[in-house]
């Protein structure tokens, strides 16, 4: 049975949820308090310049591909994606930087040039990171997140020891040069946690970095927001901007309406 559904906010999660709910046959309306959509991924236009004011890294392109595929679409139907080469540079001071290539063999060579033996160590580290990535995408990322028990699968059980160690410990066991250590520890910051608090299993973020590469949508990350907006509208979602939700009416523990 079709339901009338209200979504407050218009960031990535809101637009994604709106698309899936509309596809399921629901009457969906997004209410956004700002004049433009995007949430933390909004865009700033000023004095002839355009800025992404939120995310600037496009990693894990397979996740975006899967999202659009759920609606028989492709990212390329909406925006052009460019793989950055080199991927990025990490600065440690004035004219003191390490360039990260767009492919693993070159990155391995870069590591080896900085610390003897680190190339082989990186290959081993990345093999484990890829294994973790495959498990994360298959068994974890798309779970609803309702219970810690969702983390327990046959595959994750085989990796149980990695949930009792952390990224900082694993990286520093393999690498001594602090530049290499910092390069390998920083990806988990995108998860909102420190390397010392992040289980070793989350090295899959390193595979997202070195294995899948860093990408950039032409015209900026806001292109992805516009793509999701277009898809949502195609699915019948209504989007109201300058619509601040002042109150959620609740009756018998259930939301029954909103005050805008």
Predicted regions and their residues:
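Generic recognition of stable, solvent-exposed alpha-helical segments in well-folded globular domains
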Residues: 10, 16, 63, 106, ...
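Active-site-adjacent bridging/hinge elements
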Residues: 31-34, 199-203
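N-terminal glycine-rich phosphate/pyrophosphate-binding loop and immediately adjacent elements
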Residues: 3-131
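Helical element adjacent to the flavin cofactor pocket in flavoenzyme catalytic cores
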Residues: 204-255
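Rossmann-like flavin
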Residues: 93-199
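A broad, structural surface signal
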Residues: 19-23, 33, 109, 127-134, ...
């Amino acid at each position: 049975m079709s339901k009338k559904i209200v979504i407050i906010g218009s960031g990535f999660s809101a637009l994604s949820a709106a698309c899936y709910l509309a596809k399921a046959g629901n009457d969906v309306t997004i209410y956004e308090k700002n004049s433009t959509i995007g949430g933390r991924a909004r865009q700033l236009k000023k004095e002839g310049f355009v800025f992404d004011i939120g995310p600037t890294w496009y990693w894990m392109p397979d996740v975006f591909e899967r999202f659009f595929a759920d609606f028989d679409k492709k990212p390329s139907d909406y925006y052009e994606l460019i793989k950055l080469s080199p991927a990025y540079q990490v600065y440690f001071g004035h004219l003191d930087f390490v360039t990260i290539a767009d492919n693993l063999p070159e990155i391995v060579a870069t590591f080896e040039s900085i610390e003897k033996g680190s190339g082989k160590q990186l290959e081993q580290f990345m093999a484990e990171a890829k294994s973790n990535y495959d498990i994360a995408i298959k068994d974890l990322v798309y779970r609803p997140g309702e219970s810690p028990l969702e983390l327990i699968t046959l595959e994750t059980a085989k990796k149980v020891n990695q949930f009792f160690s952390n990224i900082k410990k694993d990286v520093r066991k393999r690498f001594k040069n602090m530049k290499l250590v910092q390069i390998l520890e920083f990806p988990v910051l995108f998860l909102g946690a420190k390397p010392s608090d992040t289980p070793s299993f989350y090295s899959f973020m390193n595979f997202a970095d070195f294995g899948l590469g860093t990408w950039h949508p032409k015209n900026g990350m806001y292109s992805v927001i516009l793509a999701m907006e277009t898809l949502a509208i195609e699915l019948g979602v209504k989007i109201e901007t300058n619509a601040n939700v002042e109150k959620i009416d609740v009756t018998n523990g259930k939301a029954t309406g909103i005050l805008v």
